[in-house]
Amino acid sequence: MARVKRSVNAKKKRREILKSAKGYRGQRSRLYRKAKEQWLHSMTYSYRDRRARKSEFRKLWIQRINAAARMNGITYNRLIQGLRLAEIEVDRKILADLAVNDFATFSAICEAAKAALPEDVNAPKAA
């Protein structure tokens, strides 16, 4: 069997790592070992933060919806409960967009949710 010399493949692999490490500071963009270590960490951070971004956006949408809902005299959790009871299927991303860009439509949705809610159990009873 013929001997395989790794020179070409090794240089190609190193070149790819250094190419992807472009923009890192100092030795991390110039020295292969440092660049590879930083590149591995970068890929780990990217993977983790792609997942974290989803929860961060959901939190942002909920804050926006809550602020706009309170301007309409209802809290976030009561709004979501009312939407479920009224069988209005609008996700939080769309609700947040409506709250920011089309407040009149959001107000109409809030009114529909309020109408679907049962009487408040915490309200004083008229005896």
UniProtKB/Swiss-Prot annotation:
Q: Decide whether keyword Signal is in the record.
A: no
Superkingdom? Bacteria
Q: Name one GO molecular function term.
A: structural constituent of ribosome
Q: Which UniProt keywords apply?
A: Ribonucleoprotein, Ribosomal protein, RNA-binding, rRNA-binding
The record's listing under Gene3D superfamilies reads:
6.10.160.10, Ribosomal protein L20 (1.10.1900.20)
- Gene Ontology terms: biological process: ribosomal large subunit assembly; translation
- List the record's Gene Ontology CC terms alphabetically: ribonucleoprotein complex; ribosome
**Is Ribosomal protein found in the keyword set?**
yes
- Protein family (similarity comment): Belongs to the bacterial ribosomal protein bL20 family.
What does this protein's UniProt record list under function? Answer: Binds directly to 23S ribosomal RNA and is necessary for the in vitro assembly process of the 50S ribosomal subunit. It is not involved in the protein synthesizing functions of that subunit.
Protein name (Swiss-Prot/TrEMBL): Large ribosomal subunit protein bL20
> What's the encoding gene here?
rplT
